Amino acid sequence: MPSLPVLIDTTTEFDVSSPQNVTQKRSLLLAPPSIAAHEEKLRDIFTTFDRSVTDLQMLDRLSAGFVTLPASTYDLVLVLTDTNGARRNEALELLTRDIFNILTPSMKPSAQLQLQDGPFQANEGREAILAGLVEKHGAFEKPQYQEAAVPLRFGANKRKNKISPEPVKIESVGFVDNYDDDELINEDDLLDEEDLGKPVQQPAECQPETAKKRRRACKDCTCGLAAQLEAEDAERREKANADLNVLKLKTDELNDEVDFTVQGKTGSCNSCSLGDAFRCASCPFIGLPAFKPGEEVRIMNDMAQL
């Protein structure tokens, strides 16, 4: 019996490979209000971007809160400023902090914010930086934050067997009771009539050496020294007042004439005629002008008569 040829089909009947899910990147176009009057520019833009994955929003409506953006949706945010930068200033003025507060949550991690006519200048990205975006190659990118769990160990190194120290013994001190019921003894009750009749003996410390310093009585002196010193001071004051009265001139003595031309009839200081600067404290010419020696001076009714 002749052999028949065998044909083997090597083509696969089915594909077991898993289908690849390709997610297209979404873009957001932000246009200033003036571009609405130029439909041809919008048509030119949509020739570059796919309408199915591209959204167009007006900056003024977004700033007024008329439009809400979905969270974590866009991979690219492009601000339409024309290729020649004709609407750059208008668009940058509308990119306020309120716009970034709405725009930043709608961007995916690693999404970029770009201008149509070129990179951002150094002074044009302050609000973007404050919103949390990072400058990268003339554009701003939303950083990709990674969450990680960090274990916290509180006091792990302190969990060791520690030997408790022995309690410190406090040395006891004498117990003092200030509120005892003991009655105070009157010192006068300990003296009899014979003790009360004895003279008071002055302590030795109340008799200091008078040659070196004046005696001084104690504040609560009971030996009689304070009374003795007070009596001596009163006697000294009386003597000083008496000596002062001797120097005072009476009314009839003020009318006496002092003649400096007669020998022996000068003042005690011999300076009565020189003026108050040279007169003694008890001079009757105090307050009068200076006069020449030998000039007759009379004091009549407290007035100098030259």
Swiss-Prot record:
Main location: cytoplasm
Biological processes annotated in GO: cellular response to oxidative stress; iron-sulfur cluster assembly; negative regulation of hydrogen peroxide-mediated programmed cell death; negative regulation of nitric oxide biosynthetic process
Region entry Linker, spans: 151-196
Binding-site list for [4Fe-4S] cluster: 269, 272, 280, 283
Motif segment (Cx2C motif 1): 269-272
Keyword Cytoplasm: yes
Positions of the UniProt region annotated as Fe-S binding site A: 206-223
Entry superkingdom: Eukaryota
Cross-referenced InterPro entries: Anamorsin, CIAPIN1, Dre2_N
Residue sites binding [2Fe-2S] cluster per the record: 206, 218, 221, 223
Subunit structure: Monomer. Interacts with tah18. Interacts with mia40.
Task performed by this protein: Component of the cytosolic iron-sulfur (Fe-S) protein assembly (CIA) machinery required for the maturation of extramitochondrial Fe-S proteins. Part of an electron transfer chain functioning in an early step of cytosolic Fe-S biogenesis, facilitating the de novo assembly of a [4Fe-4S] cluster on the scaffold complex cfd1-nbp35. Electrons are transferred to dre2 from NADPH via the FAD- and FMN-containing protein tah18.
Family: Belongs to the anamorsin family.
Protein name: Fe-S cluster assembly protein dre2
